[in-house]
Amino acid sequence: LLFFSLSVALFISAFYHYKVLPKTEQKRSNNSSQLFQEFYLILKSFFLKPSISISIIFILIYRFGEAQLVKIAPLFMLDSLNDGGLGLSNVEYGFLYGTLGTACLTIGGIVGGILIAKQGLKLWIVWMALAMKLPDIVYVYMAHSLPSNKILIGTLVCIEQFGYGFGFTAYLLYMMMISEGKNSTSHYAICTGIMAMGMMVPGMFSGMIQESFGYFNFFIWVILSTIPGLIMIKFLSIKQNYGRNK
């Protein structure tokens, strides 16, 4: 019933915008070879950027640990105590992550944006990366102690989500920086595609790792998986005062 109601609401919204939005004729080129050539030139210009190979590796592995964690964390929260999980109900999990976690994630992103605007990305990227990755250790603690106190669990989730939002700000700003110049919008779209690949591929084998080693050892593996992303920061070339308000 819920999804049916949502589909009806989306249909009504689409119909409304179809009627209300102005209809303008746009000239479109049907020359497929020209479109392919433009696509090729944009792609080529992206891969000819200075130190682009380092940038691509960084984008791919910055969230290597978190890409695995995000797939398994919900299962850990909902799994029974006998299976090594926390045994939360769907309602409890939804409140902790959907409400508290989302709020802390947003606040972390806002705080990160404010700090970068004041002092620039170069000064903060290491600290933001650490803020994203170090809180992952709360899952190691929870998998070891299996706390039943919902306030404690909620607090740990908030810490991890705040750190994630805080650290993700630097990640986005870096992609914006390397996308600057001609075709910046297209180049940023390429970056987001690479970013999505960096989330999808590690998530594909995270379940297999968890089933083989259990929750506790899996979360230790997640901590170890965050190290390559931290190391890559050493090789990045970041513009002085980039992101800082002038």
Predicted stretch roles:
Residues 130-148:
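C-terminal ends and interior cores of transmembrane alpha-helices
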